[in-house]
């Protein structure tokens, strides 16, 4: 195993690992991604289940592709396109009076004027909190108590952002953060289809239910993507393929069928990884995605 202190190994070629690897390479690091599967993508893959028919095998909708990532990595030229954006949610009713929920309107299902008004306030509040979370997600988390100037500025910005919500909304976000989607939706709405559609959008793919703790935060996290719901042309595999293409263009080496069995240490520092076949890859940094 040769000395490669400037080398970074990223474990896992899912979308998070590929984005991480691409940004590290963009910053001038020498990066290798190791993936146990035969292809990159993780849960964002497209599979052919019958000759000529393909489907997204796990994740099937794109919620949170940050526009900065899309631009920084030139994903549009790397193969990413969409067959549909700003998708609507439909909640089916037994009597055929289905509910149709778009970004700006709710129709059908005998929605009352009270629920329509409540929906406007709900969207205003959740949208405001999501925009706050979006700003926080795009900052380097400040280290509390470090005394570092940048950390102190980061903490001040975070405190100011929360304070700028105003007293009422600030109290409301503190309250909502500790309860669940079910309780919030019960407070705001009467229509069961509307509550079902909103709770599904909030917890889909999160291994949570509407009554689970932190399910409100999960919904806010999804809304903080700020781009709405999109359907990639060719399935979710095209997202991973575009990320892999962008990463490789930046010099990232992607190795598939390369399962990591352990992270290697030298004293109290990481020095590489060992693969299933016994091969060792030296690295000054290891990122597990």
What do the PLM-derived regions correspond to, one by one?
Residues 3-145:
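N-terminal glycine-rich phosphate/pyrophosphate-binding loop and immediately adjacent elements
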Residues 4-6, 275-285:
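Core beta-strand elements of the Rossmann-like FAD/NAD(P) dinucleotide-binding domain
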Residues 12, 56-57, 207, 211, ...:
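Alpha-helix capping and helix-loop boundary segments enriched in small/acidic/polar residues
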Residues 13, 19, 121, 176, ...:
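Generic recognition of stable, solvent-exposed alpha-helical segments in well-folded globular domains
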Residues 53, 95-97, 269, 277-280:
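Short acidic/polar mixed-charge low-complexity motifs
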Residues 94-212:
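Rossmann-like flavin
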Residues 218-270, 274:
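Helical element adjacent to the flavin cofactor pocket in flavoenzyme catalytic cores
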Residues 288-289:
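Flavin (primarily FAD) binding-site architecture
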